[in-house]
Amino acid sequence: MSLTNEQIVDAIAEKSLMEVMELVKAIEEKFGVSAAAPVAVAAAAGPAAAVEEQTEFTVTLKSAGDKKVEVIKAVRAITGLGLKEAKDLAEAGGVLKDAASKDEAEKMKKDLEAAGATVEVK
C-alpha cells in the first residue's frame, strides 16, 4: 500500500520538532541531498554581481532639439544610415546603438549633444 502525499504531510505534522529534524537528516544522508535553501546561495552572489562595472551601454536619442540638420548629420555619422533613415530616427528618437563600449557611448553622447540633441546613456 502506497501513502499519499497528504498522508505523509499529516504524519510529519504529528511529529515533534526533534523527530522532524532527525527525519530531515536521515533523508539528506539517504539521498545525498541538502535541505539548505539554494536561494541563500543565489542571494549571496547578487551583491557581488552588482559591484561589477557596467561594460555595455545603450545610447538613446531622446530629442533632436532645434538643430535638426546637425543632429541628422551626427546620427548618420554614428549609425551609417542613409539620409531618410537618419532623419526619421532623429525626428522620432530611439535607440542609436546597443551594447556600445563606455568610450564609444561617451563619444556618441558628446557628438550628439554638441549637435543639439538630448541623449541618454544606460
Swiss-Prot record:
GO molecular function: mRNA binding; structural constituent of ribosome
Signal peptide: none
Keyword vocabulary terms for this entry: Ribonucleoprotein, Ribosomal protein
GO CC terms in record: cytosolic large ribosomal subunit
GO biological process: translation
InterPro entries in the record: Ribosomal_bL12, Ribosomal_bL12_C, Ribosomal_bL12_C/ClpS-like, Ribosomal_bL12_oligo, Ribosomal_bL12_oligo_N_sf
Domain of life from the UniProt record: Bacteria
UniProt cross-references to Pfam families, sorted A to Z: Ribosomal_L12 (PF00542), Ribosomal_L12_N (PF16320)
PANTHER family (alphabetical): 39S RIBOSOMAL PROTEIN L12, LARGE RIBOSOMAL SUBUNIT PROTEIN BL12M
Known partners and oligomeric status: Homodimer. Part of the ribosomal stalk of the 50S ribosomal subunit. Forms a multimeric L10(L12)X complex, where L10 forms an elongated spine to which 2 to 4 L12 dimers bind in a sequential fashion. Binds GTP-bound translation factors.
Function summary: Forms part of the ribosomal stalk which helps the ribosome interact with GTP-bound translation factors. Is thus essential for accurate translation.
Family per similarity comment: Belongs to the bacterial ribosomal protein bL12 family.
Record-given protein name: Large ribosomal subunit protein bL12
